[in-house]
Every structure is written in C-alpha cells, then in structure tokens.
Amino acid sequence: MTDLEIAQKAQMLPIKEVAKKLNISEDDLDPYGKYKAKLPLHLINAEKMKNSKLVLVTAITPTPAGEGKTTVSIGLTEGLNKIGKKAIAVLREPSLGPVFGIKGGAAGGGYSQVVPMEDINLHFTGDFSAIEKANNLLSAVIDNNIQSKTHSIGIDPRTVVWKRVMDMNDRALRHIVVGLGGSTHGIPREDGFNITPASEIMAILCLSENFSDLKRRIGNIYVGKKFDGTPVFARDLNVVGAMALLLKEAIKPNLVQTLENNPAILHGGPFASIAQGTNTVLATKMGLSLGDYVVTEAGFGADLGAEKFLNIKCVSAGLAPDAVVVVATIRALRHHGGAKKEEYNTPDLQKVKLGIANLEKHIENVQHFGLKAVVAINYFPHDSEEEIAYVKEICAKKGVEAVVSKGFSEGGKGTEELARAVVTIAESGESHFAPLYSHEASIEDKITTVATKIYGASKVNYSSKALSQLKQINKLGFDKLPVCIVKTPKSLSDDEKKLARPTDFEVTVREFEFASGAGFVIPILGDTVRMPGLPSVPAAEGMDIDDEGIISGLS
C-alpha cells in the first residue's frame, strides 16, 4: 500500500482521547475538527521540563528524495512508547511547496506516519496561511507608506529588503517589479517572493517564547532605510499589533496523533537549507512539559538543520539534547560512493565503502557539540546484510552504535531496538551540550567556525557584495547575532556536485541577508535561492480528488 492508503485506513482516536494520554483536559483543547486541536501556551511547565529527555533526529547528506528523518522520528516515538516511555513526536508542519513539488507528502512514511495525513499536508490548521498574511501585511504597509503624501516616513524604495512570501514553489516570482500601472497603483520598485518557510515571520514564530516576545521580535524586523540613511524597522510603521493578531492562533502548537495513536505535536516549518530548519520553541517546550521523551527533527543533514538547531534554537531557548539520532540509508551511502540514480537500489558494498565518509563526518559533527549519538540505518528491502554489517562496523570504530530501523514497514515494533539504544544514551548523562561558537565572536569568525568544523572547508571567501553588506550589518549592531547559513543540502560543501566527504575545498559567501527580528544573520553560500522552483514533472501532476472527496496521489 502507498503511504496515503495506509493513512486512509488508520484507526484514529478522537483528539480528546489522545489529549488524555498527556493529562490534557478537554477544556484546554481547541479542536479543529475531530482529529486536530490547538494547545494553549499555559501547558508549558518549566519544572516538568527538567525531568524530560530531548532527542534530536538528524541525518547524513541526503539524496533528493530524503532519507527518512520524519519517518524515523515518528517510528522512534512509537518504539519508545512500546518500551514503556511516554514519548511525543514534536515535528515541523509540511510546506505546500515540496508537497506539490519533488517530495510529495511530508508526514512520515509507511507505518510511521502522523495523521490525519491529508489534512496535515494540505493547509492543516492554517498556520502557514497566517504567517503568509502577517508577512504580506507588512509588505502592503511598506508600499502604502512609500506612496502616501501625508503619512510617509520617507522610506527609500531602493533600499527595501522585505519580500513578499507564498507557500508554493514558483521560480517566476523570485524577481518582480511592483507598483506598475500609474501613480494610483503605487511606486514602481523591484521586489520578489520567498517561500513561506523562509519568511522571517516563520523564523520569529519558531523562536518566540510567548506573545510579548513575538511582538518584540516583529518590531525588530529591518525593512530598509529612509532617504536620510536611517534604518526603518517594522515598529516604525505601527503595524506590529496587526501582524501579531494575525498570528493569534498560529502561535499555539497543534496536537495530532501517530498511526499507533501516540501524541504528536506539529508546529512551524522553516526549511533547513534556507532557514533554521526546526519546529517552534513553544512546541518543543510543551512536549517536554507533557511527556518523558520528546523526539524532534532538524531538516536535511547535520551540517544544516542540526547545526542551526544547536547553535540558534538551543542557545536562544536554553535547551540541550540528551541524545542525537543520525539517520543513514544504505541507498544514500551508495549515492555518496558514486552510484548513479538508477543504481541506488542495487547492493554494492564497494560504493558503500566509498560513501561511508559522509556518515563519519556527520557523526563527528554531532560530537563537536559534546553530544552522544546513535546511528539509525533506515532500512530498505534492497539493503544487503554485508552492507549493513559494514556500516555497523565503521560506526563501532567511531564509538557509536548503529541500529537498523524498520519503522516504515513495521511501525513501533520495528524500532524497539533503536528506542532502547536511544534511552541508554539519553539516560547515561554523557551528553554535555556546548554551542560551537560564542555569539560575541565576529560574524566572520562564526562563519569560519561552522565552515571549517562542520562542513570541513579549508577557507571562507567573500564576494565584494558580501563584504559591503557585512559592513552594514556591523554598523547596524547585528554582529553579535548567530549565523544561519544558507547552503545546498546536497553536499557538505557549497557545491552540490561534491559528494561523500570533500576535502581541500573553499566556500564563498555570495551575499548576506539578516533577520534582526528573528535574531540571526544569513550568509548565503553558492547559488542557493529562497524561493524554490518546481521540477519538470511536479508531484502535483499525480494528485486528484474524486466525487466522494477521496484524495489520491498524495504520498
């Protein structure tokens, strides 16, 4: 059966029954239909959090199809519950861009899914829409103020850096001109769209601790400059309150369930390649307040999502993982060993031996932060016993246990061994989290630290444009913010063609953006863009809905 067919046959519990497992009263539920609900922020309890374990799921450098972090995260949650732990999956919400683009649905796979799968993948509770509207309200107010003859604060339209957003892959919107059609239609200027997960509003929502923190961060959004050169922030446009009220419901985490009726909290959804790649601080803290174990993921490989989770989210929120799971597939190791796409599913020990260096590097990346790891080999039927044995042998030499995870085909039953390995690490107390750099270091030093220690680069270069922008960042006083590096997820380097573990390479910062509201600087490496495009044959072409409302092709 397909993922969708499995999800459609799920025996779901009413959401109030799922909430009871977490001792949440019906009065504290804000239902969105029968199987989804919003949760109030007062459920976060700092004292209860102290007794809970936080497990981060990351991965090796993925193939375009992904290596199953979400599937492993959900499967691990099922496995932990099977061995007697009160575990909650705390994950990101899917973006419509990848759903209709290259990946299809993003709610797990096989027998390790969160449900209702169709709802989660298609609009869910409207959080992304609220983020989009708050973002675009600011855009509308900026252009309105530029045009106004009586209310203008003197924004120079040439300096506006705030972009509109839409939750769809649409390369045609990357660079546009707005305000055409004559003076009554606005002042013409260059603009563009980012995808909603790359919006600073998304980043702000994901890092905010409460409503007042949300409003403070929104007020700190940098918009551009006045004609006299002074900076303009969102607070100068008197729109912070209106933007915040659009996020009134979006700030609340969403409760759903797994196929085995265990609780899952989904909230926020920034990408890890072009944003910070982790769910909200509020959802993570709520999970830690309600359960014994929280299983959360960070997007793409440990060079992207995990690095940002640890250096940005954990530092900002005062969190520290007790264990890290590095997801690897034999398929991806073959890929890094030089296998062509049509060879991914053909056993080839030699290719695995050539590609294993990528896994070794990601294990080292976790260890750089003082954290203990376990490797989850996300099992596929075409994995040979000798390939699996080799991966286990290499991991053992690195002091790390590797466990086969069969959550996709078996659900929680197939992840019990992984769950026990995670519990052993989490309860050993051997993880001692330390961020990779001090926020007091210079922007250049922070970038160099990540590039050399995590990517393995020998040097960081800067374009003339980047150097000019860096001067502006320092002048504005944003140099003490952490860095959220935008980079290809397909390689440890900034060149997607360099597979496995490249050596003796340099990376280039092409330009800078900064998210002063969210609280980080954004160095952009290579040719990465913040508005993806659709593939030649998008997943959307295979989707449909019949007269009975039954969806097909969403997988």
Question: Model regions: which residues?
Answer:
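Flexible phosphate-sensing "switch/lid" loops adjacent to ATP/NTP-binding sites
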Residues: 1-555
